[in-house]
């Protein structure tokens, strides 16, 4: 185990214990573990904060399993009735979510969700999920496919027509692709306000 990996692992262990993410007696409330890339450096990510080494990611999964963490799937009904738990998500739709993260999480029977920036798929952008991979992911009962808009933009900055196009364009593309309703979104860059939420709920 190299030094950077040791440091990252110890930081995760400290933070997870501090917030009760990996403990059997978990603190109340639902927490989200949001990942992006697993093993592939991300463009313009100078400090490599959006990419996690597969070995470290496997440790995360192992800790959740060993400590009997309540990992909640967004495919479950009435998930918000849970007193405590963790939701595992991936933003953007990197191909390694399918190639690397899926086998690891499946080995521990951990459900997860993938929020996809659909124009990355349309443009066949390097390192991102293909249509075929998205279809295969959607066939798993414990995997939720959601929207991350069409482009990775700040939704709050868009006028109403552009905002509507971003949201409905992504939703329509994914629904046509997998043949299932898309009823979940992760807002790109965390950019959301009342206007954005209202259009999402329409």
Q: What annotation goes with each model-predicted range?
A:
Residues 1-37:
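Membrane-proximal basic amphipathic "stem/tether" segments
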Residues 24-28, 81-82, 107:
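Extracellular/periplasmic catalytic domains that process cell-envelope and extracellular macromolecules
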Residues 33-40, 46, 50, 84-86, ...:
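Metal-dependent polysaccharide deacetylase catalytic core of the NodB/CE4 family, i.e.
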Residues 49-82, 175-177, 201-202:
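C-terminal domain-boundary segment and adjacent tail
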Residues 54, 58, 95, 160-165:
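Non-membrane alpha-helical structural segments and their capping/turn regions in soluble enzymes
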Residues 91-92:
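Noncatalytic alpha-helical scaffolds and linker/capping helices
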